[in-house]
A protein has these predicted regions:
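Mature catalytic core of soluble alpha/beta enzymes
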Residues: 1-426
C-alpha cells in the first residue's frame, strides 16, 4: 500500500526510522518529530523481545521450544510468555471462536508440511527444476500422504491449557501467530511512541498500517476532502446487530490517502482509501488499515500422486489447506476511545479471517466493541458484472467525470458500507 498526506500535513511526518527485516517484512516509522536514539533503541529491543517469544522462525524462540520435545523437557511443559502476550492470546481466543476454528495458532505444523518453514526463500516460485529440494528456485516441495508426524500435537487452540500469558503442553505443538501477531507488535510499538508525547506518526509493517491521531495544530492548516466513499449495493455486507457508523471525513481532520495494491500487480491499485485522522482525545487510539494477500508467499507443492498445486501461507485451519477464491483483503479499524486497545492486531487478524470465513459471520461473531470495515476481492466475476480493474496509483486513467476509469478484470469486490475507499468499479 502506498501512502500520501494532504496539504501542510504532507511535510509533517518527514522523519524516518527504519527497522529492516524485522517481523519478516521490515518496518518503517515516519514521524512529525525525530524519534530520539534512546527511544529507537527501546523500540528495537521491544521488537527483538517480541520475536524471541513469538517467532516461529527463530531457533531460540519460546514458540520454537514448544514444538521441540527437548524444549518441552527443558521447560517442563510450562511456557511463560511475557505478560504483554496475554491480550494477543485473548484476541486469538476471540478469532478462534468467531471463525469456528478456522483461525488457529496450532496451524504451524500444517504450514511446515506445506513447505512454509525455515528458510522459506529456498522454496522459491515458478516451474519445477531437476535439483534437490531447496537447492534451486521453483523446486516443488513434496508432501507425504500422512499429515502430522507421530507424537505431534494435532488438537486446536482451545485444547491448550492457558493461564494468562502462560501456556502448558506436554506434547510438541508448532504455533504460528502470523494471522494477528505482526499487527499486535505494531500496536505495542505505537503505544510506546504515543507515551513519548511527541508528534503524529505512521507505522508501516509490510502492509499493516497504524496511523496515530493527528495533533491539534493540524486542525487549521490541513486541506480537507469530501467523503470519497463509493457505494456499491451489490457488494455491500451489512451488520444487522451493530449501528452503522459513518466514516465521512470531517472538516478539521487530517487526511491520509492509501493506494490499495492490486494483488496480482504491485504497480497498480484497485482503489484509494481515505483515512481521516482526528485530533487526539484522551484515551483515543489511532487508526489501523491492514491488508492480506498470498501473492508474495506462494510456492509449488507436489502431492503424493505427483500432481502439482500452488500453495500459499494463508490456510484454513480446519482443513490444513490454502484458502481459495479470495485474492486479497483489507480491514479498516477506525480510531476509537474504547474497546479497541489493539486496533492493528484486530485488523490484521480479521484480514486473514476474511480468507476463510464469511464476512457477515465475522460481524455476528466478533465482540460488539470491535468496530471494523472491510474490502475483499474474490476470484473471477459474475457474468455481466463489471469488476475491479488495476490502475496506476499515480497515473490512473480517468473517465469523463474525473474518476479513475473502470474496466473488466479478474476480481469481484465485496465490502462493508463504511469502508472509506473509492473502489475502481462501476
Amino acid at each position: 500500500m502506498r501512502i500520501s498526506d494532504t496539504g501542510a500535513a504532507f511535510a509533517a511526518e518527514r522523519h524516518i526510522c527504519a527497522f529492516p527485516g524485522v517481523l519478516g517484512t521490515g518496518m518503517i516509522i515516519t514521524s512529525e518529530k525525530g524519534i530520539p536514539q534512546d527511544a529507537q533503541d527501546s523500540l528495537r529491543r521491544s521488537i527483538s523481545g517480541y520475536e524471541a517469544a513469538l517467532s516461529r522462525f527463530l531457533p531460540y524462540s519460546l514458540v520454537r521450544a514448544m514444538g521441540d520435545p527437548q524444549g518441552i523437557a527443558e521447560h517442563n511443559g510450562i511456557f511463560e510468555f511475557p505478560e504483554y502476550c496475554r491480550p494477543l492470546f485473548d484476541i486469538y481466543d476471540s478469532l478462534y471462536e468467531a471463525t469456528d476454528g478456522r483461525i488457529d495458532p496450532c496451524i504451524g505444523e500444517s504450514l511446515i508440511q506445506l513447505g512454509y518453514s525455515v528458510p522459506f526463500d529456498l522454496i522459491g516460485n515458478g516451474p519445477a527444476s531437476s535439483g534437490p529440494v531447496g537447492t534451486a528456485p521453483g523446486r516443488p516441495r513434496s508432501i507425504s500422504a500422512g499429515a502430522t508426524p507421530a507424537g505431534f500435537y494435532t488438537a486446536g487452540w482451545r485444547s491448550i491449557r492457558r493461564e494468562g500469558a502462560t501456556l502448558y503442553t506436554r506434547t510438541p505443538v508448532s504455533l504460528d501467530f502470523g494471522a494477528a501477531g505482526k499487527g499486535f507488535c505494531v500496536d505495542l510499538l505505537s503505544a510506546q511512541l504515543e507515551a513519548l508525547g511527541g508528534g503524529a506518526f505512521t507505522i508501516d509493517a509490510g502492509g499493516d498500517l497504524y496511523f496515530s491521531t493527528a495533533r491539534s495544530q493540524y486542525s487549521q492548516d490541513s486541506q480537507h476532502s469530501q467523503d470519497s466513499q463509493h457505494s456499491h449495493e451489490a457488494g455491500d455486507v451489512r451488520d444487522p446487530h451493530r449501528p452503522h457508523k459513518s466514516h465521512t471525513v470531517q472538516a478539521g481532520t487530517r487526511i491520509t490517502r492509501v493506494a490499495l495494491e492490486d494483488p496480482s500487480d504491485s504497480d497498480t491499485a484497485i482503489g484509494i482509501c481515505t483515512i481521516g485522522r482526528s485530533t487526539r482525545e484522551p484515551g483515543m487510539r489511532g487508526t489501523a488499515l491492514c491488508a492480506s494477500a498470498p501473492g508474495r508467499r506462494t510456492w509449488t507443492v507436489r502431492r503424493p500422486d505427483s500432481s502439482l498445486i500452488q500453495a500459499h501461507h494463508i490456510l484454513d485451519a480446519l482443513t490444513g489447506k490454502p484458502a481459495r477464491d479470495v485474492e486479497a483483503t483489507w480491514v479498516y479499524a477506525p480510531h476509537t476511545s474504547s474497546g479497541m486497545e489493539y486496533p492493528t492486531a484486530w485488523a490484521d487478524g480479521l484480514a486473514t479471517a476474511l480468507f476463510v470465513c464469511d464476512p457477515q459471520h465475522l460481524y455476528n461473531s466478533t465482540p460488539p466493541e470491535i468496530n471494523f470495515e472491510f474490502l475483499r476481492l474474490l476470484s473471477g466475476h459474475p457474468e455481466g458484472r463489471t469488476t475491479a480493474a488495476g490502475h496506476s496509483a499515480e497515473n490512473a486513467s480517468k473517465d469523463a467525470s474525473g474518476r479513475p476509469a473502470a474496466h473488466k478484470a479478474r476480481y469481484t469486490a465485496q465490502h462493508s458500507p463504511g469502508f472509506p475507499a473509492e473502489i475502481f468499479i462501476e
